[in-house]
Amino acid sequence: MGKVYDWFEERLEIQSIADDITSKYVPPHVNIFYCLGGITLTCFIIQVATGFAMTFYYRPTVTEAFASVQYIMTDVNFGWLIRSVHRWSASMMVLMMILHVFRVYLTGGFKKPRELTWVTGVILGVLTVSFGVTGYSLPWDQIGYWAVKIVTGVPDAIPVVGSPIVELLRGSVSVGQTTLTRFYSLHTFVLPLLTAVFMLMHFLMIRKQGISGPL
């Protein structure tokens, strides 16, 4: 094992990378409330894992979506647990994100030179809420259907561009298969990818600038 490690160490300098990660200075004022962002990340990872597991059984069609969710809950081994953990971690992610925003705002973590870190955090907040909106519709039950109809109908009140925005969100004038397909694509591919990119940017900036000081 030693020779294998030495081979990789010679080429990748693993030890120097590990030393840089583990030797980062942590200010003495940091407490448990500074862990809220990390907890949000943990919830996101759980979301990805459990969501990926459910894609093996979920069918994104208006005729089969609800039945496939019922199948996951009743027939798939531990399917009820996987979906429940997905729902619980989704709620926890939103809660931790809100608390994290409050902590950053109250401690002045958004001030110079961390403005861009705050901007990426706000974008992550919007993406998190978008996860909730798109995921809520996927079972395609009465609650999900009417929630989508109401949410996608809100832009219709905007003059001139309202109707095109509604059609863009729904895929047509009315809510139907194209709407479910778009929401499924957003929920399982577009939003996770964007969230991963902005989380990486967010953490790299925190890594570069360090944790903000006390008030």
From Swiss-Prot:
Heme b 1 binds at H100, H202. One of its GO terms (molecular function) is metal ion binding. Binds 2 heme b groups non-covalently with two histidine residues as axial ligands. Binds one heme group covalently by a single cysteine link with no axial amino acid ligand. This heme was named heme ci. Pfam families: Cytochrome_B. Heme 1 (or BH or b566) is high-potential and absorbs at about 566 nm, and heme 2 (or BL or b562) is low-potential and absorbs at about 562 nm. This is Cytochrome b6. GO terms for cellular component: chloroplast thylakoid membrane. The chain crosses the membrane at residues 32-52, 90-110, 116-136, 186-206. It is found in: Plastid, Chloroplast thylakoid membrane. The gene is petB. Keywords: Chloroplast, Electron transport, Heme, Iron, Membrane, Metal-binding, Photosynthesis, Plastid, Thylakoid, Transmembrane, Transmembrane helix, Transport. InterPro entries: Cyt_b/b6_N, Cyt_B6_PetB, Cytb/b6-like_sf, Cytochrome_b_N_euk/bac, Di-haem_cyt_TM. It is a multi-pass membrane protein. The 4 large subunits of the cytochrome b6-f complex are cytochrome b6, subunit IV (17 kDa polypeptide, PetD), cytochrome f and the Rieske protein, while the 4 small subunits are PetG, PetL, PetM and PetN. The complex functions as a dimer. Component of the cytochrome b6-f complex, which mediates electron transfer between photosystem II (PSII) and photosystem I (PSI), cyclic electron flow around PSI, and state transitions. GO terms for biological process: photosynthesis; respiratory electron transport chain. PROSITE patterns: CYTB_NTER.
